[in-house]
Amino acid sequence: MRIAGRDKLDEFSGAHADARSWIDTWIADAETSIWKTPQEIKNNYASASFLANNIVIFNVKGNRYRLEARIAYNTGIVVVQWVGTHAEYTKRMG
């Protein structure tokens, strides 16, 4: 998969060093994967949540943080839309 919005991940992991290893591993996994269905993501990320419009919420570091991405299964693109703390995510989703 190609990752768009990687700068958001780099910025976040720079500010939250405890998330860096997880994010680096996720990037490596996403870049070497070819996700064609939500189930293929679920197989590796059992706690991932799937929303409308191909939005996937990944729990980072035991749900301390959240990563929101839109998956374009047909083109192989992952668009990182947002990454932040679980508390920030809860506020966003209001």
Language model segments and positions:
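Basic, Lys/Arg-enriched alpha-helical interface segments
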Residues: 1-64, 72-79, 86-94
